[in-house]
């Protein structure tokens, strides 16, 4: 049996952020907690949402104590801020960090028996839907606005906790590329490759099916068409819109069928070194694609190659595998993604511990090739 869980309502297009006010008012909400991060306040992005709320006479308060890899403390402080604010809904503005934090706040507020954030790891058995949240992404990568997942860092145990819960999905997603225009080149590149990782991992996961394949093939195509241009010229509206659409479509798929060991291996890098999630995924993706080519998913690499712009007419499966991996690696290099773990501060002596953490990650079960701690450690060494 297959299942698709999506937002009740979604808006897409330049300037569509104005729809937030109508959605809040027609649902009868009285006050908003705007969950965002300090850089978005500093660079004036949050002000664009504040303007929408002010123009509609919707009162709000702001919570912005959020790290790039949000922590248990960020969640609990945000929960306290929500309770103190008297708000009855949230607007989550940002990348996965802000939106994931808002999801966790909303779940715990309405399911107080899960105040220990660690108890939410894995498939959380919550009973109540989260506080109604309107998610507004400012990066084209995580697709947190449409997924049933969120990731919180347990700093004490150096662990990223993947939480899966259909009750956390935002009731409304607003994908406005105008809010993504200020992303610097490096963030555009890493979040874009994060979206590509979502698309490829969920395209080849054993849980993939006709509808998810449709989403992911199109997402890969759009990323191939638009990521390089979005990195080169952040003001290219067509490229920004293409990437905004791609990451959302990728999220529609992976949220419902799962991911694989690119994510399993990326999560410990964030927990150990605070490595940005997109950078970790982008670096690891080609290496894991090589590993997963020896699996039943091998035949689908032809589809990946085709979506990446390769003329696959007459290609054998083996040729398709090589072409897909090369196309992904070439795109990664073209947007200046680091190619080795040693370049991003990973320590050789940590590789075994990283492998143990990755093997125990919830995403490992979605990998098309069965794996082991030893296999993952070997992959880390190859990528080092």
Q: Where do the protein language model's features map onto the residues?
A:
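An N-terminal, well-structured beta->alpha segment
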Residues: 1-63
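Glycine-rich phosphate/pyrophosphate-binding beta-alpha loops
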Residues: 141, 248-281, 361-365
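Short, amphipathic C-terminal "tail helix"
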Residues: 347-384
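N-terminal small/polar loop signature for handling phosphorylated ligands or for N-terminal nucleophile
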Residues: 41-114, 229-240
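Gly/Pro-rich interdomain helix-loop hinge
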Residues: 272-350
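Carboxylate- and glycine-rich phosphate/diphosphate-binding segment that chelates Mg2+/Mn2+
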Residues: 51, 149-257, 374
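Glycine/threonine-rich beta-strand-loop-alpha-helix active-site module
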Residues: 73-178
């Amino acid at each position: 049996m297959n299942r698709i869980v999506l937002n009740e309502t979604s808006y897409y297009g330049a300037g569509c952020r104005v729809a937030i006010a109508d959605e809040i008012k027609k649902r009868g909400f009285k006050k908003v907690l705007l969950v965002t991060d300090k850089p978005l306040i500093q660079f004036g992005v949050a002000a664009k949402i504040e303007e929408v709320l002010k123009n509609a006479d919707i009162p709000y308060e702001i919570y912005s104590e959020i790290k790039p890899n949000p922590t248990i403390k960020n969640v609990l402080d945000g929960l306290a801020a929500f309770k103190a604010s008297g708000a009855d809904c949230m607007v989550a503005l940002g990348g996965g960090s802000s939106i994931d934090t808002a999801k966790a706040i909303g779940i715990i507020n309405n399911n107080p028996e899960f105040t220990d954030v660690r108890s939410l790891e894995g498939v959380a058995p919550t009973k109540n839907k989260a506080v109604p949240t309107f998610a507004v992404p400012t990066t084209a990568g995580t697709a947190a606005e449409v997924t049933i997942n969120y990731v919180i860092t347990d700093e004490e145990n150096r662990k990223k906790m993947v939480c899966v819960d259909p009750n956390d999905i935002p009731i409304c997603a607003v994908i406005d590329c105008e809010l993504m225009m200020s992303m610097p080149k490096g963030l555009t590149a890493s979040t874009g490759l994060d979206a590509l990782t979502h698309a490829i991992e969920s395209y080849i996961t054993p849980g993939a099916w006709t509808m998810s394949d449709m989403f992911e093939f199109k997402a890969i195509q759009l990323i191939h068409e638009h990521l390089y241009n979005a990195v080169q010229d952040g003001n290219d509206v067509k490229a920004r819109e293409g990437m905004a659409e791609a990451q959302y479509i990728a999220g529609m798929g992976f949220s419902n069928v799962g991911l694989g060991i690119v994510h399993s291996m990326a999560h410990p890098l964030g927990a150990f070194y605070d490595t940005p999630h997109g950078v970790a995924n982008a670096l690891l993706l080609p290496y894991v694609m090589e590993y997963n080519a020896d699996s039943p998913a091998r035949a689908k690499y032809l589809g990946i190659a085709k979506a990446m712009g390769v003329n696959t007419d007459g290609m054998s499966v083996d040729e398709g595998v090589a072409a897909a991996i090369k196309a992904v690696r070439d795109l990664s290099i073209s947007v200046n993604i680091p190619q080795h773990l040693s370049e991003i501060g990973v320590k050789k002596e940590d590789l075994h511990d990283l492998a143990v953490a990755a093997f125990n990650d919830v995403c490992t079960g979605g990998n098309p090739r069965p794996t082991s701690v030893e296999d993952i450690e070997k992959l880390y060494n190859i990528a080092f």
